[in-house]
Amino acid sequence: MDNALCYLQHLKDERQFIFGILNDNVREINIAKKEIKQLREYVGILQQNGFTGEALVSQMEYSMKIKKIKKLSSQYDINSAENSSGPYDFSFIGNELTIFRERLSNYSSWGVMHSIPSMPESIYIYMNPIHQTDEVDIVYQGSNDNYSYLIKKNGRTASYEHQITLNLAKDAVKKHNLREATKQRIVNNRKVNFITKYTEVTTNGKTDQLAVPLFLLHLVKTATGYKVSYITIKIILEEQVESNVNIVEIDTGVEMTNAEVNAIITGLLSRMMMVTNFVLGNSMVHRRMLRQFIGMQVKVIEGAYVINSQKGAGSNLLSGMYGQGVIATLSSLATLLESTPQTVKPNYVLNGIHTNDIEQKEYEVSSILKYTTNKSKDRKVGLAERISNINKPYSVTMTLGKGNGGILAIREYSALKFNYDYPDQLDDIIPSNADSSRPDAVRMTMTKTQSNNDIKITTTVHIILDITDYKDKKVSEGVIHTTLRKSGIYVKLEAIHNQTRSEAPGSLGGTDSLVSTTLCGIAQVHSKTSALSELSNNGGVDFFDGDDVKRDNNMCTNRKNFCVKFTTTSRSSPSVTLDIKSLGKRYKGNFPMIIQRVVDLTGREAWAYEAQLSSITMDNVQLRFGSKQEISIKETSQQFVYDDNGIIKVKYEKTLSGSVLKDGSKITTVIPDQKFNSINDIDNILTSRNQRNLRHRDVPWTGANNATAKYNGFRDDGMWGRKESGLMQYNNEDDVIIPIAFLGYTTSGSGGSRYILREYDIERAQQLMHTITRRDRSNTRQGQKNIYVRDGTSSGGYVANWHAMKTSMYMSLPGKNIMIKNVEINDIQELVLPNGVYDQILLSATNITLWNSVLILNQYVVYIKELAEDNARRLDVVEKTLNKVIELHQTMTVTPEETAQEESGWDIAGRIFTMLGAVVGMFFPIIGASIEVLGLVATGVGSIQQGHIVNGSLELTLAGVATVIGGYKLQKRLRQKYTLEGIKDSIKIKMDKLKEKFGTRVKNTHIGKEDSNNGVSTSTNKRSIGKANNTLTGTTDIEIVNDVINGQSAHITKTTYSQISPELQDCYRELDALLELTGNVEHWPSGLNLATAFDIRLTEKIDKIGKGKMSINAIVHGEQRTAEVNDAVWSKCVGVKANVEDYTIIRSAYVDTVQKEEMINVDRDIIRDIYTANGTKIVEKTSVGINSNNVNGKEYTVTQDGDISQLEHVITSGTVNDQSMQLIIQRCVLYYSELSSSPSD
């Protein structure tokens, strides 16, 4: 009896435990409701402040991600080895890093840093070539507290044209004739031998140095993902440290713990590894190469502080954020080493930012990976600690054959460099030690040296690149001919040109100091169809020397330039020819060759040739050209603006609510409601409203008068362009120029120092948009004007460029999250998702999942080839998941009467839908979500509201997946073990069987199972437990109706829970609401039956406290379920949950959209827009085609002309059969393929 009483008390305690969990869930629901309410209010506030379209979406995305990081950090153990095998490496979202970021946010009054990984912008860092015939001295002068260098040429202080780039790799020191003392001080085993850029000495007696290890700059940007251009890195020159452990000293003006330092390092390294996986594909050589860099020695990385440092102002970087005019992006690496930061002022920054009257200190770059740790058993070893074995000093050289060697930059591209000083020596780029089995291979070598006292270990990694069409390894007439192979690499040609002061149309004069950082512009070939066809038709694009060729459209008037000729031999085998011979006659130096992979909409390689041109001028560093990936679009009545993340559409006949800029910026200026027919009308409106500063064309141009310059306005492809003489121009009138950024300069006059601010935080940028003013600069030459972002505190201001106002921070990655919750916008045309999955997408009242799928299939084909070919790790995960699908499918073929399982075939079907959604969602997240919605509908789990019914999406989705991956390795590999048709048919057969058995009403019953030890029969027949009113029964009425696509679909007519314990009824009702609101993401595995999911949650909770596995029924209703019971259902449920959670992070944002209030919908308007935008029409063929493709006896096909109304007929008539829709899908893909490869007429 005592035992029985104890057991009853035990059950009572367990029940209290369960109710505690339920109450927690209710609280979570209320919090979720509150958050949604706040979110809607927030959207309203944003709209009232002018945020619309992309700006609104980006702001919403930013806000939601800040909240989500807290949940992510709690859900993921960042140091767990298991998590590293997931689709992303989330180790950088550690609790420590979260704490650190939140702490930093207290000192940065405009928000926490972004927390979702993103690919960095191109980091254009260039070396200024040293004239080989000149002897260059770098004279060390200064004391232990203040290191400075004089750069002398032939014994004289260097003039402006003689900026110098030091390649501090050991072998390169000799080439530059450096003095021995300098060599010993800078290049030794304890110093990191990266290329370091120095500016020259000015003539007014002040010394302005720029010392930035270029690769470290790239590392910071890549690791943080923050769009911060100006991160300066101090090189510490100090005496030998006695201890072998160099403690990382990081000072943000606030106390930091070792864990926070650990988090910073871990975030840095994990992001580097993540970027490696995506950028460098499956090349283990590349990955090995990058892992070498992870061991680099970093002690101080100073963040992008941009300070209005008039004399005596802003000395403390972290005090008076607005009062001192500090505009900074505190990345996770934005730290200062000095113990007294208020005495430190930055005196060197990149790309036009400059300060004056600043004390200079340089520091040794030392290890960040060795630090003291507490190895207690309750602490998990961090990533930084695990890789501490590679933290030794090393040098890096990357050489292409016998050229000058040295590493130019390792950004998101691989970088090569070869020397073209002497065209007759160009065959040197073929290494003598080339792989004998691959005679056409060029080898790039990276060497890492690990030094331990007197022992040095050198590791060399070779990166092989194919270069063909060499005649016996000889290059005739100095022309390098590189065939771009199928591996997805294209050549980006870069060249640097330094200006002399005398070449500038105006000079700074007086005591103005100039930051002579070489700035390279980028010009890209654009056409109505594709860069490839443009090159084919025009025989290449020439960039002529302004001194040799005079044209109306010449680029670089009165400026020395260089000649680059692009030619193509065939569309199937594109190539780039660089006329080095003519180049070498006039110009000596290193010509960097950048290799990048680009994929177009069809999954093929897109060869968007582009040359990078320098555009520095002495009087004002003003302009840079930008290039984006070319996406071929036919000319229509629409106009387009390209950005990193897709296409922004501008319709002339529509009323705009804002002006859209080339680089994706959204200037939230409201244009009066009126129709306009040309860009000139917009121009007039903006001008009349004194908002000329919001237009791209107001970027200053050297050699042009803004007041009289005429512009072409939108080109055929929507870019901004002009014909008048400017800094640089294309020669071909169809080509366009894209000014996306300009730089300000500094002056030591009474106006104080002025700085350019590039690419800073979204929220701050949007705040500043409202305070942009335009005013003239009295000391600006040639009447040029700059745009200032005022902080309202002093006469100084900040020059902001358009790139800084870019509102979308994240580039597209496979499986990238989109987070949109209840977005309400004024103009339905303006919503543009930020990650380029769609050309455009609208929220509307209806949901046409069919076209949702068509859009995804057309857009995501960009990524599927890369994933299928380059990511074996993900493929393994997919295969494991599909194994689970097959396992569930096999289980599903057993009827409930044949097994002791406590769920019906419908439950298993729902889980198959869930798992299938998880698999598909890895590549097509929205389709994966749609499959899960279909699973909810078909299996009667969850409550589906009107308008959310998915008609036949499973058939289309599976067929679409097969279409997309057709011909690639993934399909070939999967076909060996699974067939999509087989899975699809099996599910259909089982559903048919269930319909035969249950009719159109399926009763879904969940009843607990009893242990025979208690004397209860173990018969497989369903039976209730205890009293009737304690039986937990869920009943779902499913109506099977005909479907316009595949003839059948399931609709939920009613879902009820009957005979539930009264104390549980409200809880289940709340949980239903929670499922609708959150899409199951944060709380339950998607698609599982509610009660099953509930049991899983409770079972796991109970497991944690060692009470054994017990069902919710058994616990709540006082029935015993011992831990010894080997119940397949529960173990399977738990297994499913674990498997699903692996993909929850990827799919969460997409599933979030499948909720009660809003879904991502596509209606006829967007269909019309998509097809119109691409010049695609649906036309009725005059003759009847194949019967299987007929619609009411008429065949509809996709062509490049015709009446769009036929497409509407296909959609609205309800007569489309599955074959015709497949035809449309296939033709869409074919159309993109033809568009990117066919020549332009």
UniProtKB/Swiss-Prot annotation:
Membrane spanning stretches: 261-281, 918-938, 947-967
Keyword set includes Membrane: yes
Coiled-coil region(s): 21-49
Keyword Membrane in annotation: yes
Biased composition (Polar residues): 1013-1028
GO cellular component: host cell membrane; membrane
Topology within the bilayer: Multi-pass membrane protein
Keywords: Coiled coil, Host membrane, Membrane, Transmembrane, Transmembrane helix
Region entry Disordered, spans: 1005-1028
Compartments, as annotated in UniProt: Host membrane
Protein name: Uncharacterized protein S3
Organism: Diadromus pulchellus idnoreovirus 1 (DpIRV-1)
